[in-house]
Amino acid sequence: MKKITRIGIGGPVGSGKTAVIEVITPILIQRGIKPLIITNDIVTTEDAKQVKRTLKGILDEEKILGVETGACPHTAVREDPSMNIAAVEEMEARFPDSDVVLIESGGDNLTLTFSPALADFYIYVIDVAEGEKIPRKNGPGLVQADILVINKIDLAPYVGASLAVMEHDTQVVRGQRPYILTNCKTGEGVETLVNMIMRDFLFTHSLQATQ
């Protein structure tokens, strides 16, 4: 049976997790990748509805599923990811020719990480408007992520944030782990992010699955 890569996408409330999914999905499809999308909210499925509206005509809405976790966001993707695992398995069974499942967590703090039982890799999204000190806070979510996305870079001059400082601090806390600066409104950095996903997640994981 084909192994479908599972990629978690986490980060604080409002950092742009949903926006990242909305901008990378069309590019993945253009490159021949068949995605599924699962979003998490605590008491609604609002993110799934938003993604369906944005990707209408691009991705079949049946391939977008909202999970109402009713619990702390990191609990639903780390301590007890059973609800999300069930959702992933359901979607994979319905669409077995898919290549990747994008699993968006609910918005949480810098401690959010994904259980390896749920995600093969994970991306952590922060945004410039949270302040340039965010990388220095050294939370496990942003430090351990396979890719760190620093989003909303256009807002830096409006909040007094230095992108150079954020990049320096990111390199200090993450070492050689990759990161990317993005603006989901203009598309800046998005193609590079997709290249990283294709190279580091999809291609590598597909090779491992066939060995």
UniProtKB/Swiss-Prot annotation:
Protein family per UniProt: Belongs to the SIMIBI class G3E GTPase family. UreG subfamily.
Gene giving rise to this polypeptide: ureG
Subcellular location per the Swiss-Prot or TrEMBL entry: Cytoplasm
Gene3D superfamilies, sorted: P-loop containing nucleotide triphosphate hydrolases
Record GO cellular component, one term: cytoplasm
Alphabetical GO biological process terms: urea catabolic process
Species of provenance: Photorhabdus laumondii subsp. laumondii (strain DSM 15139 / CIP 105565 / TT01)
A Gene Ontology molecular function term of the record: nickel cation binding
Name of this protein: Urease accessory protein UreG
